[in-house]
A protein has these predicted regions:
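Conserved GNAT acetyl-CoA-binding A-motif
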Residues: 88, 93-107, 242-253
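Conserved acetyl-CoA binding element of GNAT-fold acetyltransferases
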Residues: 64-76, 216-227
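Conserved acetyl-CoA pyrophosphate-binding loop and the N-cap/start of the following alpha-helix
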Residues: 78-90, 228-237
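Conserved beta-hairpin
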Residues: 36-50, 194-213, 353-354
Length: 363
């Protein structure tokens, strides 16, 4: 989309998503200079759009460009006419041409995106806070958690990014790589929803961070901490925010004994784009020296075919497209491959899933 189209982009966004004005202001002051927006028009009127927000993911220490798909919207008068399909087809074409391994999104309804090859790859742990002080009182009984909390500012963005990459890189197999711009955006985003990013110190050492938003209720969107510190951050947050009903999202932490609702909820769906790039990211049986896959992709025809993967120490050393499948080639779809790689579907012979995943972005 061109700069002169942004008024129409904002109109369609609000018609479809009804965000608080403060959040819409954040998004349209921040993201259009960083992302790509594809749109369809009829008689100069924008009727459908898709936003492609760039991120860098890290898988076992290998960083790669990826795209977070948001803002998929169609004017109510033009729905069920194939406009979203056209935009997704164009998206796949563009991102395949850039050799991006995968794209991902947070679905309003997974059934909308399953026909396009998207499958769940990440579930998020949550604690639902009670309307009264139940959890806050339970945790405050533990006493002083021994941490000091500070509200982060843009001047802290670089330190936050370096710390988060160190924390996540030591514990997660797949996560969103963060830089100064990432935290500039997150600080603006949380502030637009009445929240903030907190930095937790023990003495002079940064040991954890938390990001929350707060309207009528609050939502702790993310807790990051070095091993052993998550419960103490939860104690601090519950003690300071526990008088308001809300939600905490974080790595798993025992909440059953406090009598609060908790569990995992599906959050992110992923889709393979450039298959050969994706295969180079995967984990394989360390004892194997090769694997042959015969792959089917109903939408990206270039991904169809047979591929021989030379394996060394459980990683792909070389990926070769074959003219004909070898004997013993494993027949898979891109959907099966995506789910097996992220441990969300049936296991596939020879492929070891990523176990610890952390993809928490909203936009």
């Amino acid at each position: 989309m061109l700069p002169q189209d942004m008024d129409q982009v904002g109109r369609l966004w609000q018609e479809c998503f009804c965000d608080p004005q403060s959040y819409a202001d954040f998004y349209f002051r921040t993201m259009p200079g960083q992302n790509r927006i594809l749109g369809l028009k009829e008689k100069e009127r924008l009727i459908s759009m898709i936003h492609l927000n760039p991120y860098v993911l890290s898988a076992d220490g290998r960083r790669f460009d990826s795209t977070y798909i948001v803002g998929v919207a169609t004017d109510a008068a033009y729905r069920h006419q194939g406009h979203m399909r056209r935009l997704l087809d164009r998206t796949f074409e563009c991102l395949y041409g850039e050799r991006q391994p995968m794209a991902y999104l947070m679905p309003a309804d997974p059934k909308i995106y399953e026909p396009f090859g998207f499958r769940y790859i990440y579930q998020q742990f949550y604690i639902k806070m009670p309307a009264a002080n139940t959890l806050g009182e339970y945790l405050r009984a533990a006493g002083d958690v021994g941490l000091r909390a500070y509200s982060a500012s843009p001047a802290d963005a670089r330190q936050l990014a370096e710390w988060a990459n160190d924390c996540l890189g030591s514990r997660m197999d797949v996560f969103t790589w963060r830089d100064e711009r990432y935290y500039d955006n997150l600080l603006r985003e949380t502030a637009s929803d009445g929240g903030e990013v907190l930095m937790f110190y023990e003495g002079e050492r940064l040991v954890g961070t938390a990001a929350y938003i707060a309207e009528e209720t609050y939502e702790v969107r993310e807790i990051l901490a070095y091993p052993g510190y998550e419960p103490r951050l939860v104690e601090w947050l519950a003690g300071h925010l526990g008088d308001r009903a809300g939600m905490m999202l974080m790595p798993p932490w025992k909440a059953d004994e406090a009598g609060v609702e908790n569990g995992f909820r599906p959050m992110i769906m992923g889709r393979i784009l450039y298959l050969e790039s994706f295969l180079r990211l995967l984990r394989f049986d360390r004892e194997a020296d090769h694997l042959c896959l015969e792959v089917k992709d109903d939408l990206i025809q270039e991904n169809n075919g047979s591929f021989r993967i030379v394996i060394r120490n459980g990683k792909a050393e070389k990926v070769t497209r074959l003219d004909h499948p070898e004997a013993g080639c494993l027949k898979v779809t891109v959907e099966m491959l995506m789910q097996a790689a992220f441990g969300q579907g049936s296991a596939l012979q020879g492929i070891q899933p990523f176990e610890h995943i952390f993809i928490n972005e909203i936009v």
